[in-house]
Structure formats: structure tokens, C-alpha cells
């Protein structure tokens, strides 16, 4: 079941929370709405579900306009962050609930409901807990029950509002893998809200990054990481180093050092340079690729690589976070050399260098 979101606007009083949002979601795709608090992601999810109504614009499911349909008529499954299980019902009865309250003409027989719920219990690996009550379950088990309940009515669209937000880190990782496997098996169209970058990129086919009621970028997870469309996406998607400097002529100046850009930008003046830890060239020896001296102030071994915090020596004031491959862990106080690869230059929100990779090499 495809979803078409066409020019959706939403305001609460004088506060505009969604600004002309348009997005097409193909049938069978799993999409993450990713953004900080206040970005509009949960409001958009609730509008898709029919739990909120847009101020203007349209929602279409497989070409049919559902903008004015009540939530129960849209036939979507919805999973809340805090499970919303019925405390007085067993696991079995919670999952069966959506089937038992269907109109009589649509309601399966008791035998069919039992068969369906038993299948779902096996699918979510909770058959042995069918007779327990929610208070007797762990957080991860409760979320599986909530998901099974949403799937019981066989929705063609599944919506999830921060489904793993209330769980501890290890359980979140396990459920993310499980949800992805379930999606591969059942091929339902799914949209979920999260503020967790790792969760979005691990689970989703496509990540929609939102900020202040706007879509900043809608793309495959690896492209959101490697080719951020805006400065907001670049900074929001994870740890990034920022250096302030100045463009003069065809050179980038920081402190007493300058590097050739390989071109002369139309803009001249103060800029911010961004690059992720793994985009920094790092070596124990100085070279054309790694000419800048730094000193290790923190070293955190991560197995096949080490995450370092290094202090530039004489050429910049703030520490940088970098990644060094291999098992030979640098020691605190050790002197290394870095080069700034794949750097991006911005003046405010405006990117000022070509979109191909920029390498800041040997000091001029």
C-alpha cells in the first residue's frame, strides 16, 4: 500500500508545525521520520494515521484520498511508544482485541481468532507467555505484544511512534533487528518516528530528516550519512568536527595556517569547515596527506579501530575527534599528524565549495 503525502500543512493556533510537506512512500517500503523534538515528525505520523487532521493538503493510500477518513476507517496499525496494553487482559486477549471489536459482518469466528493470535504469538516469539498479564512482562516483551496486536487486523500500513524509545540500549538493538526481519518477511508499508540516528539508518529503507516542520532530506540511509543535503543534516546525523576559519582568494585560513582550495569561491570571508571523525586522515608520520601535528588526549579502543580525541598543536584551539584503524592503539600524549579529507565549507547554511570531495593538504 503506497502513501502519498501532498502539500500537508498543520498549525496549532498561531504555531505552524508542518510547512507544505510532500512525500511519496512506495508500497512495501520502511521509512523513518527522523528529527529532534519539535521537528513535526510525530504530528506528521498522526496525520497519516488519522489521529490528527491537517490544516491543508491531502493524504492518499494507493491513490485513494483518505484525508477526511476517521482513523478506524484508514485500516492502519499503530504502535505507541508506551505500548498502551490493557492491564486487565492477558497477552492473548490483548492481541485478539482488535479482531473481537470488529463489526459483526467483518469479525472472524472465535476459532479463526484463536488461530490468528496463536500464529502471531509464534511470530513474535511469545507463545509461552500467552496467559500472562502485561505487568508480568519485560519492556521488550510488551513492545512485541503491542506490535502483534497492531498486525492482528492485517493492516497494509504500519505506523510506529518511537517504538523502542522506552527500552534500554541492548533490548532496542535486538528489537530493531527483529522488526527489520519481520518487515522483510511480511513486506508491509511502514513509517516510524525516531530521534535516534542509528535506529533510523539501521532499520529503514529510507530516512526522512525533519527540522522545524520541514523535510531537510529524504534519502537512502548511506546517502544521508555520506551526502547530507543541508548543514542541519550534516550536524544532526552524528558526531562531526567543526573548524572556524576564513576563505581568502583560493585558500582556507585557520590560525596561522592556510591551505589551497583548488578553486576560488565567489564568497570570501568567515566560514565553518565540517568533517566527520572517519574523514580525517591520520598518521604517525608527517606527509602531504597528513601534515598537521596533533597530540592524543584521549584514546578509546573499539576493537578494529580506536576513537581518539586529539589537540591540534599550534594551528587550532579546539580538540578534534578522529578514528584510527588497526590494533596499535596510540597512547595519551603521543604526537600524530592529520589531514582534513572530505571537508565541507559553509557560510551560515550555504555550502560554498563544490559537492565533490575537498582535500585540504599541505600548508601553503
Curated annotation (Swiss-Prot):
GO cellular component, one term: ATP-binding cassette (ABC) transporter complex
Catalysed reaction, written as an equation: sulfate(out) + ATP + H2O = sulfate(in) + ADP + phosphate + H(+); thiosulfate(out) + ATP + H2O = thiosulfate(in) + ADP + phosphate + H(+)
Binding site for ATP: 35-42
Record keywords: ATP-binding, Cell inner membrane, Cell membrane, Membrane, Nucleotide-binding, Sulfate transport, Translocase, Transport
Lipid bilayer topology: Peripheral membrane protein
Family stated for the protein in its record: Belongs to the ABC transporter superfamily. Sulfate/tungstate importer (TC 3.A.1.6) family.
Protein name, entry field: Sulfate/thiosulfate import ATP-binding protein CysA
